[in-house]
From Swiss-Prot:
It comes from Pseudomonas entomophila (strain L48). Belongs to the CbpM family. Interacts with CbpA and inhibits both the DnaJ-like co-chaperone activity and the DNA binding activity of CbpA. Together with CbpA, modulates the activity of the DnaK chaperone system. Does not inhibit the co-chaperone activity of DnaJ. Pfam families: MerR_2. InterPro entries: CbpM. Coiled coil: none annotated. This is Chaperone modulatory protein CbpM. The lineage of its organism: Bacteria, Pseudomonadati, Pseudomonadota, Gammaproteobacteria, Pseudomonadales.
């Protein structure tokens, strides 16, 4: 029997992990870059992927001087590229089985 560990972070912990201010987290949430559970910032709970996403978002915002809307789009496109690469790799493996026969 296997169990799944679910990690959730509150606002303070997320800010510490991602080295981001609460004001930026609120702004990033407003643009849909990360989506917490809870109604207010005091109640927000984030999943374990949120610190990485926040760090990437802040880096794009600062280094490329993108507005948050542009950051959201860039992150969405980067995720889509990663998914396509994974799918392509899987399809290559499946195709390789047929060509080795």
């Amino acid at each position: 029997m296997s169990s799944t560990l679910i990690v959730q972070l509150d606002m303070r912990t997320l800010c510490q992990e991602a080295d981001v201010s609460a004001d930026w987290v609120i702004e990033i949430v407003e643009h849909g870059i990360v989506e917490p559970s809870g109604r207010t910032p005091e109640e927000w709970v984030f999943d374990d992927r949120a610190p990485v996403t926040l760090k990437r978002a802040v880096k794009l915002h600062q280094e490329l001087e993108l507005e948050w809307e542009g950051v959201a789009l860039a992150l969405e496109l980067l995720e889509e590229v990663q998914q396509l690469r994974s799918e392509n790799s899987m399809l290559k493996q499946r195709l390789g089985r047929f060509t080795q026969m």
